[in-house]
Amino acid sequence: MTRLLPRWFVERIAPVRDEDELPVSTLELFFDLIFVFTVAQFTAIIAHDPAEGLLQTVLMFGFLWWMYAGYSWLTNVIPPVRPARRILLLCAMAGWLVVALTIPAAFESGSVWIAIGMLVVVLVHGLMYLQAARAFGPVFVANLAAVAAVFAAELGPAGAWRYGFWALAAAIVWSVPVWHGQRGLNLHPAHITERHGLVVIVALGESVVAIGIGARGLPVDADLLVAAVLGLAIGACLWWSLFVRDLPGTEHALKATTDQVKRVRKVLAGLSYAFIPVLVGILVFAAGLKHAVGHALSPLDFESALLLSGGVAAFMLGTAGLRWSMRLPRPWERVALAAAVLAVAPLGLVNTALQLAAVVVVLVGALALEGRASAAPRPAPAE
């Protein structure tokens, strides 16, 4: 497919060696700021209607996360060091902004603009990859097919039709690793790990924003301060659970995996697939926190209590998937931790602060036990 592109556009990209530094650029950080807005839109949808909003979020997030993670892979393989690449990334940011702006309308009135935004995102992504990777052609076609499904969803009637085509879009892109294989990519372990970690940091920022939004117009009293501080404590525990041991262990495991195909498979399983419950869990928790702020001394409704505990539990299940994929120690401990966090959800029906405090106690206790059991992750076997 690179033969269809002008010669001046196609270039040979030399992969960066594992031992050489490939820091995340400021342009990539700027690019990630769009994700802040995207996360905020999904959080608002879930907070407004937990059941239907969560279904809509999962369907849209399936396709959007595939493409967003795709840009992390893109800048890993083709660093944005030339002006042309930087301009293309900025054009992609415009597409992502259009997508984020139109997320609330996607399942309500329908908006062809979200499909147009995704088309821009996919075209820029594909053209940049095709500069250097001819094998990307079939993936590009699959991404375009997913965009076509989004056009069909937004131009068709509301209801089952729209849900069905969004599900089809997600199914198309996530089937790619099954039939295309994982050859032709050389991923830099430190960069790909840091890039995905930064996306989680951005998403965790939404939980802090949720505190501010929930507190808007409320008096600064014990109700507000207790819920805010406990909510921040939970966010801190989520950060600790991923960044203190698991992500450093992930980078080490990827460096130890010298076979590039096996490395790509680990990144797919651990940083792409497993990060879906990690990120959606943060969105769900933030939506529940919006309802909790300002009502710490009152009971929560069932849906809000489930959002608070369910979001944290989903996050922990995602970290279990990461540990399993990277062969890090004790993934099943995180499954047990997710169950324990869910078990305290009924406390919110009695008192909001009681549930928040119970979640904090469960998380801190589990993380303390993990820290005592292993001060550092065991090295993954070289492959």
Map each language-model feature to its residues.
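Transmembrane helix-boundary motif of multi-pass solute transporters/channels
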Residues: 30-55
